[in-house]
Amino acid sequence: LILAATVWLVNEPESNTYFGITSFLYVPVGSYDRNDTLNLGENRWKHTLQAGYITGLTSNISLDLVGDVTFFGKNDELGASKATLEQDPLYQLQGFLRYNVTPQWDLRTGISHTFGGETQINDINQDNDLATTKMTIGTAWFANPGLQLIANYGSDLSVENGFKEQHRLNFRILK
């Protein structure tokens, strides 16, 4: 379960300038059994604080800049030994350019860098800080004012301590 709310500190549609802060609270409601290898839940709370800035560079081109930090609660029932899992904050910086072909349709490209998030098990550092840089190109279309369809292709440019995605295709429907 993810609870989210945004506070708009700047909301100026006439100049296409926006600045908002969003808080995401991840509630541990999935099933979790420390003896299972795979669990749907993490048995811990998470909180992400995200700041996003959008500005129109021209009448058809927008720049989106987003930064966020995720804080993790601890899981004190990790594995059969009931170890304690703790995690350092995880940071992400994103930048996107969007070109509005029409008011309903845009083309977009972006870059993202995620870093941090080292874990500790029973206070022993796991030396697993993440550092991932990825690129995305895509398109979005408002089929009607309440329905947006998004398609993005992406690839990881560099990965430290994780799996590298050569190709990724994402489809989103927002209503």
Identify the meaning behind each predicted range.
Residues 10-19, 59-61, 104, 146:
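Short loop/turn motifs that connect adjacent beta-strands in outer-membrane beta-barrel proteins
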Residues 77, 82-175:
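Outer membrane beta-barrel transmembrane domains
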Residues 24-35, 68-72, 97-109:
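Short, charge-rich amphipathic segments
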Residues 41-78:
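Hydrophobic, aromatic-enriched interface-forming segments
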Residues 9, 25-31, 55, 69-73, ...:
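Transmembrane beta-strands of outer-membrane beta-barrel pores
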Residues 1-43:
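Hydrophobic alpha-helical segments and helix pairs
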Residues 3, 17-23, 47, 63-67, ...:
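Transmembrane beta-strands of outer-membrane beta-barrel proteins
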Residues 3-9, 23, 49-55, 69, ...:
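Residues on the lipid-exposed face of transmembrane beta-strands in outer-membrane beta-barrel proteins
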